[in-house]
UniProtKB/Swiss-Prot annotation:
Pfam families: RsgA_GTPase. Zn(2+) binds at residues 297, 302, 304, 310. Keywords: Cytoplasm, GTP-binding, Hydrolase, Metal-binding, Nucleotide-binding, Ribosome biogenesis, RNA-binding, rRNA-binding, Zinc. It comes from Vibrio cholerae serotype O1 (strain ATCC 39315 / El Tor Inaba N16961). The lineage of its organism: Bacteria, Pseudomonadati, Pseudomonadota, Gammaproteobacteria, Vibrionales. It is found in: Cytoplasm. Its cofactor is Zn(2+). Residues 112-273 form the CP-type G domain. GTP binds at residues 159-162, 213-221. This is Small ribosomal subunit biogenesis GTPase RsgA. Belongs to the TRAFAC class YlqF/YawG GTPase family. RsgA subfamily.
């Protein structure tokens, strides 16, 4: 296979300028009401900028539509009312008029924009982890907090298990059995060997599922395994040799129909899942194994640390609560506190140019400067200090 020639900086700049002009042209389209049909239901497949791909539930056809002004929060999985155009103008064939009420919405905190919707009307959150990049139980716990808070059923999937030796697989099973013990489903899968794919299909059937997890854990590879009939495979990411972190592939969440039943939404990978928008009590209640003990501590304001008479700590000492989960709980609460303090401090400072900041971060990530000095004594604690 011939390697693609790398574009020069000038070529990249011209491509971006052409794309920008095209988007401006599409956004400037004003439909004559006489050219629009009657409103009908549709399903959002993906959204980018002021446009969205809407599926007609009757024909299954996909229509690229403009969004009416005032429609801002639109994500994959949303049910909408849209009006088809009598003709296609600059690739646009309709207009989204309204968004129907959601049964659920997965959100994640954005440092600049508050809570950012990721997917709507989700029945199940598929938390994809893998053995490469290293397994982080802390990130699994963060997603479980999100799922419990939002009322979305979680499913834990450990991917790339073909890379595990028998000894390591036994160790990973020991860690993940703590989650099975408190009622969470855990699957071991491998696209390479096919192990667990059939079981995963059964778990996804008749549900709208959102795939979440770090970049590089293989979410897109699982999408390809579940959707073998895709004309073009979803791009699969590699692992940075410098940082050991996954490189982002999916740039916008997209909904797919699974041939064996159910839908799935492949979301952009995140390296950590911030929870600073939640209160400590929300996090505490999201730990399902804590609930029988809450309210029984000696002190009403017990922080569940070294406080005397703490029922949670007593339960940990008796083996009734996982020590690893309990330790992650304190790490998460601490990181939330630190991140909230940093956020409040940054608001009091002069605003920083977002584009310049992102460009600097992109450069650092490319050069492997960020995270390159993180000590990784155990996969249990990797990437745990981000709120």
């Amino acid at each position: 296979m011939t390697k693609k020639k790398k574009l020069t900086h000038g070529q990249v700049r011209r491509v971006r300028n052409n794309q920008h002009k095209k988007l401006k042209q599409e956004e400037s389209i004003v439909w004559d009401e006489a050219l629009l049909g009657s409103a009908q239901p549709g399903l959002v497949i993906t959204r980018f900028g002021q446009h969205a791909d809407i599926e007609d539930p009757v024909t299954g056809e996909i229509h690229r539509c403009n969004l009416r002004r005032g429609i801002e929060s639109l994500v994959s999985g949303d049910n909408v009312l849209w009006r088809p155009g009598a003709e296609t103008l600059a690739g646009i064939s309709g207009v989204v008029e309204a968004v129907e009420a959601r049964s659920s919405v997965l959100v994640r905190p954005d440092y600049y924009d508050g809570l950012k919707p990721v997917a709507a009307n989700v029945d199940q959150m598929v938390i994809v982890s893998s053995v490469l990049p290293e397994l982080s139980l802390n990130i699994i716990d963060r997603y479980l907090i999100a799922s419990e808070t939002l009322g979305i059923a979680p499913l834990i999937v450990l991917n790339k298990i073909d890379l595990l030796s028998p000894e390591l697989r036994e160790q990973y099973s020991t860690w993940l059995n703590d989650y099975r013990a408190i009622g969470y489903d855990v699957l071991y899968v491998s696209k390479k060997t096919g192990e667990g794919i059939a079981d995963l299909e059964v778990k996804l059937r008749d549900r709208t599922n959102v795939f979440v997890g770090q970049s590089g854990v293989g979410k897109s590879s699982l999408v390809n395994a579940l959707l073998p009939e895709l004309e073009e495979d979803v791009e699969e990411g590699a692992i940075s040799e410098t940082s050991g972190l996954g490189q982002h592939t999916t740039t916008a969440a997209r909904l797919y129909h699974i041939p064996s039943g159910g839908d799935l939404i492949d979301s952009p990978g995140v390296r950590e899942f911030g929870l600073w928008h939640l209160e400590t009590d929300d996090v505490t209640k999201a730990y399902v194994e804590f609930r029988p003990y809450l309210g029984g501590c000696k002190f009403r304001d017990c922080k569940h640390g070294d406080d005397p008479g703490c029922l949670l700590r007593e339960a940990v000492s008796k083996g009734e609560i996982s020590a690893l989960r309990f330790d992650n709980y304190h790490r998460i609460v601490q990181s939330m506190t630190e991140n909230k303090a940093n956020r409040q401090y940054s608001r009091s400072k002069k605003p920083i140019c977002k584009s310049k900041l992102l460009a600097s971060l992109e450069h650092l990530l490319t050069e492997g400067a960020i995270f390159s000095n993180i000590s990784r004594p155990s996969p249990l604690y990797w990437n745990v200090n981000h709120g």
